[in-house]
């Protein structure tokens, strides 16, 4: 009998994995699975991805232990006491149209995950802590198969912040499969998922010895022959199924990349000013993806299709005020304005000419340089 993470049931049973999943449901998660700690193939491939430089300037991905080994390639280098990884997921999709369904060139696109009223790191972590706080209550005294030898319980929570590759453990916890766009895709919820993990010293019985298994099994890959995400990427960042070159990815370029964006990639950014959803927007599994009921993930209306003019001329005070508690702050004001003037250059809208002429003399040299490029784009089209 196989076992995959499913939408969490309302009923309770006596098994420890089911009770853990019940805690996750009570905390507001829609999916929960439990993976063993193994040297999974995807983790073994991680050093090669780093060696190829496909992580770009994200130096934190290169974090190494005292022996010089990449931490993200093995949990043993991060938390050697970990025996099981609890992976929780919550849907953040909203009722607004996808980026591929809205084409207004005078407005920019902020990635759907960043619209929320509360930073997802905090919202998901709060739920994880609620689960973590009750785990010890589930353990029977002196149950050596579940607790470490000294009887204590060790845990650690991560929400996109720790030195591990969450999607790999999400796959092996049965939460979903890793799509060709590298996102976790769930058959019922699609890929609009925030992931949170709890590392724990709880050791469940081996999968092969229990029916149903104590650990969840990987969800089967249901991408099939579909390559829509690969074909739709404007910058060809998906270099092979399941393999992303961050240096070409619009999300990386608009969020993580500091300084100048290579000229040959600017046109591909289109109207994106923070992140990109295209590879998820075109995914067939997201056609009927349900919307979230979580209040924290309802959108701030000002962040849905914001006017490029507003973004390009934003002041530091307005940036701090508008994006307080928002992931958009990661791009910093300079990066957001840079992205906005690139989008103006891609808009083919001559109404931006006066603004770009002013911004070409901006005190921020990055904004000024990209405004000059954008100005040239519009002027060349008007001739």
Residue ranges and their predicted role:
Residues 2-220, 261:
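Auxiliary alpha/beta "docking" domains used to position bulky ligands
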Residues 310-314, 322-327, 355-363:
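Alpha-solenoid HEAT/Armadillo-like helical repeat scaffolds in large eukaryotic proteins
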Residues 320-322, 349-360, 380-383:
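Amphipathic alpha-helical scaffolding segments comprising HEAT/armadillo-like alpha-solenoid repeats
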Residues 333, 363-364:
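Short inter-helical turns and helix N-cap capping residues of alpha-solenoid HEAT/ARM repeat scaffolds
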Residues 343-346, 373-377:
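Core register positions within helices of long alpha-helical scaffolds
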């Amino acid at each position: 009998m196989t076992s995959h993470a499913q939408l969490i049931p309302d009923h309770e049973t006596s098994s420890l994995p089911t009770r853990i999943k019940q805690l996750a449901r009570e905390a507001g998660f829609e999916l929960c699975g439990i993976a063993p700690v193994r040297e999974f193939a995807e983790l073994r491939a991680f050093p090669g991805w780093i060696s190829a430089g496909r992580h770009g300037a994200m130096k934190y991905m290169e974090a190494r232990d005292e022996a010089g080994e990449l931490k993200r390639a093995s949990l043993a280098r991060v938390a050697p006491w970990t025996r099981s990884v609890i992976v929780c997921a919550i849907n953040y999709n909203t009722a607004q149209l996808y980026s591929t369904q809205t084409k207004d060139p005078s407005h920019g696109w902020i990635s759907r995950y960043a619209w929320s009223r509360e930073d997802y790191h905090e919202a998901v972590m709060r739920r994880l802590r609620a689960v973590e706080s009750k785990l010890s209550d589930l353990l029977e005294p002196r149950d050596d198969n579940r607790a470490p030898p000294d009887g204590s319980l060790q845990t650690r929570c991560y929400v996109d912040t720790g030195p591990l590759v969450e999607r790999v453990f999400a796959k092996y916890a049965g939460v979903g499969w890793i799509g060709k766009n590298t996102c976790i895709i769930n058959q019922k919820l699609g890929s609009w998922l925030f992931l949170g993990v709890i590392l724990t010293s709880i050791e469940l019985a081996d999968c092969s010895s229990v029916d149903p298994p104590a650990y969840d099994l990987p969800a089967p890959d249901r991408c099939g022959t579909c390559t829509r995400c690969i074909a739709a990427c404007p910058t060809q960042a998906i270099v092979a199924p399941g393999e992303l070159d961050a240096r070409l990815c619009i999300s990386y370029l608009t969020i993580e990349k500091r300084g100048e964006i290579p000229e040959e990639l600017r046109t591909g950014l289109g109207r994106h000013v923070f992140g990109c959803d295209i590879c998820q927007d075109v995914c067939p599994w997201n056609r009927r993806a349900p919307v979230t009921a979580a209040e924290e993930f309802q959108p701030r209306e000002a962040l849905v299709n914001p006017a490029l003019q507003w973004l390009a001329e934003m002041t530091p005070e307005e940036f701090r005020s508008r994006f307080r508690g928002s992931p958009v702050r990661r791009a910093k004001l300079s990066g957001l304005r840079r992205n906005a003037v690139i989008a103006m250059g891609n808009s083919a809208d001559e109404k931006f000419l006066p603004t770009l002429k002013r911004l070409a003399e901006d005190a921020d040299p990055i904004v000024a340089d990209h405004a000059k490029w954008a100005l040239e784009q519009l002027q060349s089209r008007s001739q």
